Amino acid sequence: MIQSSLYRALNKGFDYQILACKDFKESELAKEVISYFKPNIKAVLFPELRAKKNDDLRSFFEEFLQLLGGLREFYQALENKQETIIIAPISALLHPLPKKELLESFKITLLEKYNLKDLKDKLFYYGYEILDLVEVEGEASFRGDIVDIYIPNSKAYRLSFFDAECESIKELDPATQMSLKEDLLEIEIPPTLFSLDEPSYKDLKTKVEQSPLNSFSKDLTSFGLWFLGEKANDLLGVYQSIISPRALEEIQELASLNELDDERFKFLKVLENAQGYEDLEIHVHALEGFIALHSNRKITLLAPNKTILDNSISVLDAGNMECVIAPFVLNFKTPDRIFISLNSFERKKKRQKSKLALNELNAGEWVVHDDYGVGVFSQLIQHSVLGSKRDFLEIAYLGEDKLLLPVENLHLIARYVVQSDSVPVKDRLGKGSFLKLKAKVRAKLLEIAGKIIELAAERNLILGKKMDTHLAELEIFKSHAGFEYTSDQEKAIAEISRDLSSHRVMDRLLSGDVGFGKTEVAMHAIFCAFLNGFQSALVVPTTLLAHQHFETLKARFENFGVKVARLDRYIKTSEKSKLLKAVELGLVDVLIGTHAILGTKFKNLGLMVVDEEHKFGVKQKEALKELSKSVHFLSMSATPIPRTLNMALSQIKGISSLKTPPTDRKPSRTFLKEKNDELLKEIIYRELRRNGQIFYIHNHIASISKVKTKLEDLIPKLKIAILHSQINANESEEIMLEFAKGNYQVLLCTSIVESGIHLPNANTIIIDNAQNFGLADLHQLRGRVGRGKKEGFCYFLIEDQKSLNEQALKRLLALEKNSYLGSGESIAYHDLEIRGGGNLLGQDQSGHIKNIGYALYTRMLEDAIYELSGGKKRLEKSVEIQLGVSAFLNPELIASDSLRLDLYRRLSLCENVDEVGQIHEEIEDRFGKMDDLSAQFLQIITLKILANQLGILKLSNFNQNITLTYSDEKKESLKAPSKDDNDILETLLKHLHAQISLKRR
């Protein structure tokens, strides 16, 4: 009732500076009322901050930054004598917040002089994290005379200094690390946390460090807020405040759980509800009927544009109607007026770049070389070759063997990520065994790719059942989803509709993480088939998935007359024969089931949807192929497909990918804690209080029963199920089914349950001994919770903080602070590496993947598909550079090894000269003017690309004499003006460019 009550209060006289609401949704609705009816009042919206006193705020970092930004806006408006109000979820107002003096900003102005050391110190005391690379809010970096700053709740900027003078201020794109062209005159820099100087910073730091709080990072980011003392205010006590009835209920509930003392809220004025004032929820299809019923009141209809207005309603000229083109969301009625909005809230998605650098090469990690196999990357090292200095990667192989890989050939190696249950073994140099293994894998891949292409060609000749995909009922079906489709879902639906309405049978793969909306897309296709008079089959590998899909489809199709039935091992024999008869007679529209479906006779089957096809056995797959030969075929998979493989596969089948999480899905809240009994009880009770379920990951079968006993001692009557690899498949499925039904509260398992299973009620995951898991493992585990509308909680538990090395601690802290969802393909890709992804194409290849590594395997598979389908084959970049030229990215220009390594990798992957030019621009933008050694390395990369295009295998020189060796063993000689590095490179570049020009003619 927030909108109608607030509208009434505004009309009676309203002089409050804070409105406390139940949650963010209610706050958003309240802000719309104030912004529309009182545009002169500055309304500042706070986020939710569901942190309890003394919680580690790293887990709430993004919301905390937004809250501080909103508070600073409020203080500035007050200072400017502007009428202003904070509209906030009650959770953001429960704790004292910083006074104005702690949120002061400072300015940097073009052409003014600054001491860079003082600036660095100031940013540090203001809470900025000083790093090599600026990627997310609250970070800064100093590289010589170039300073990057990412201001919280704002943008990133790049400042260039010359002799202490600020020479340029430009906006920075953190995704590309490039600055934008336009120069700015000035920027204002607020604190990330608090505007402190050295003494006040040290004072607060001491208070935090001496506190008894349990955390891995006792710093100001984690706990500074709780120790501000007199420098913080209870906003509700200081400013005129009013609270919504639902916010008051929230406070009373928290008080009943002993989570806060409600005494201090009793003095607050409560926003009154009144008779005749009511918030509305009207569906667009019921709009005209509603308007006709209320002809006695003045109705204001708001819409984003005239087109939507005209398409939504035909009675715009009624005497009591007023139409307003405005973006506000207002839906309420009063005794004499009604406001209805055709607008919806736009969720501003931040373009988050994952801070979890999963593709980064780190010393000590396993790598696989295209020709020499599996080894360990030891270090980035400089060596003298032919009297010139060059950078190399040192890779350790079996025995004491070492390979020095020139950095321009970094494309020849990839990270070798093994599944958690296997131990990698180094290859031996010089035996040629790895090349033999590769040849074996290639032969198998050509066979697999051949079968796929043959099947695709066969299907392409079959005429499909053409369907009308533009029916009005499909739009009505979409509008009843109860949520907005993501752009990826819209695109996938359009692609499937195009297939269904063509004359060919559809063969499409729909891939996307669990909870990203694959089933909704499939249901749209099933409903389309139903409207066109066809039956559909949904085939799944497990009874649990059949049960889940049956419940989902039954509920979704309830109001649309679609008859849904299920066939699995739980259906009684007597019922089964009746069901099969009904399917044959066409009395069932959608049949859902396991492989039991495969022998079923349908009256008019038009669409077959298969979920997690790669989990079926060989015989079942053959039966699937037979049944689906002449019908539209949609395969769904939660296994992510790397982008390049996706491109190769799209030559032979349709591929749709869902990469965007639903708009209302939040990232899981992550906590890193030292394990103790009290903490375990608190975590479990917190989830049970909201009637949820818990995953408890304990990756050791031998001691899993002891963990169960301990949990039962801590919380008697706790219903716990155990699941691990030694329990047989049927029993495992039984346990999962019982857990999905809610008959267990905790699932105690060695690793997480199957990826394709959606368990929206399990929203807390506890990971025992988190230090023993890899980064991508942990991110994948965390992604298993928070998939419904409830927020997910993830706890990384460590037995003993002192036993952690610095690297492990850094890795875990990075995960705690960065909860971004689906942080790009790198997570999906590594997820696949961890899970094996062995039967991505329907035949188990996990043995081959284990031997040669996932990256090399997918690259070889792409090549096999291109080769057999007549596509463009990848150019091999195997030019050998034996030039006596010093060329490397100079550490004086780029001090960080990891940044240099990243640039080396990207340069080695360049396919054309333009890409090298772009990286050249980027280096100068990020690090300053390029020196000769660095520029010469980029020229070496350019030479490699040109030589590759001309079929040259080797470039070498002796003094000023240069030799070019071609693939047909032909040799060509050139003479440079001198043996200077510059002359050698210039002579070669000039000659190769001329050769390319001749070739193009």
From Swiss-Prot:
Q: Where in the cell is it found?
A: Cytoplasm
Q: A Gene Ontology CC term for this entry?
A: cytoplasm
Residue limits of the Helicase ATP-binding domain?
499-658
Q: Does the keyword Cytoplasm apply?
A: yes
Q: Which SUPFAM superfamilies does the record associate with it?
A: CarD-like, P-loop containing nucleoside triphosphate hydrolases, TRCF domain-like
Domain of life, per UniProt, equals Bacteria
**Any Gene Ontology biological process:** DNA recombination
Q: What PROSITE patterns does its record include?
A: HELICASE_ATP_BIND_1, HELICASE_CTER
The EC number(s) attached to this protein equal 3.6.4.-
Q: Which UniProt keywords apply?
A: ATP-binding, Cytoplasm, DNA damage, DNA repair, DNA-binding, Helicase, Hydrolase, Nucleotide-binding
Q: Would I find Secreted among this entry's keywords?
A: no
- Helicase C-terminal domain residues are 679-835
Chain sites annotated for binding ATP: G512, D513, V514, G515, F516, G517, K518, T519
Recorded hits in Pfam families, A to Z, give:
CarD_TRCF_RID (PF02559), DEAD (PF00270), Helicase_C (PF00271), TRCF (PF03461), UvrB_inter (PF17757)
Gene Ontology molecular function terms on file: 3'-5' DNA helicase activity; ATP binding; damaged DNA binding; hydrolase activity
The enzyme's first-digit EC class, named in words, is hydrolase
Q: Cross-referenced PANTHER family, in alphabetical order?
A: PRIMOSOMAL PROTEIN N
The protein's job, in short, is:
Couples transcription and DNA repair by recognizing RNA polymerase (RNAP) stalled at DNA lesions. Mediates ATP-dependent release of RNAP and its truncated transcript from the DNA, and recruitment of nucleotide excision repair machinery to the damaged site.
Family, similarity comment? In the N-terminal section; belongs to the UvrB family.
The record's HAMAP family line, in alphabetical order, gives: TRCF (MF_00969)
Instruction: Tell me what this protein is called.
Output: Transcription-repair-coupling factor
- Name of encoding gene: mfd
